[in-house]
């Protein structure tokens, strides 16, 4: 009788553990190529946090997000062109940057090569020229 009781208890515990094993509903996978609807604000926030002097930016331009090959994957990318100042308040000259998006959010904004942004269709980006949201702003 005792053996039967132990076997029954083990069976109940096993069923309980199987129920907790995570084989239930799975979280839906995130779509890596959701259109970045808020791309301009994400660029502004990133530039605020990465530029030595995020004030008085001039000649700012941005391209529309476009799906492009990024390594083995396709991702939404934008190109940003601007002339910003260094820590000594001297303009550094116009630079192109490329921004990579994952699931609709900017994950990387780095200097671009001519191959990456040389043929980008830029549009004026006045919001970047008016930028002053950081502790660095004077």
Task: Go through each PLM region and give its residues.
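Cystatin/cathelin-like cysteine-protease inhibitor module
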Residues: 21-138
């Amino acid at each position: 009788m005792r053996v039967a009781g132990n076997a029954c208890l083990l069976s109940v515990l096993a069923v309980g553990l199987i129920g907790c094993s995570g084989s239930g509903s799975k979280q839906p996978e995130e779509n890596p190529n959701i259109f970045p609807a808020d791309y301009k604000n994400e660029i502004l926030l990133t530039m605020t946090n990465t530029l030595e002097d995020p004030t008085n930016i001039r000649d700012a331009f941005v391209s529309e997000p476009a799906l492009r090959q990024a390594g083995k994957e396709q991702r939404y990318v934008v190109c940003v062109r601007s002339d910003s100042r260094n820590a000594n308040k001297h303009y550094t000259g116009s630079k192109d940057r490329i921004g990579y998006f994952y699931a609709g959010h900017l994950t990387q904004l780095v200097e671009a090569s001519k191959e990456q942004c040389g043929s980008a269709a830029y549009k004026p980006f006045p919001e970047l020229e008016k930028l002053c949201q950081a502790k660095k702003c004077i």
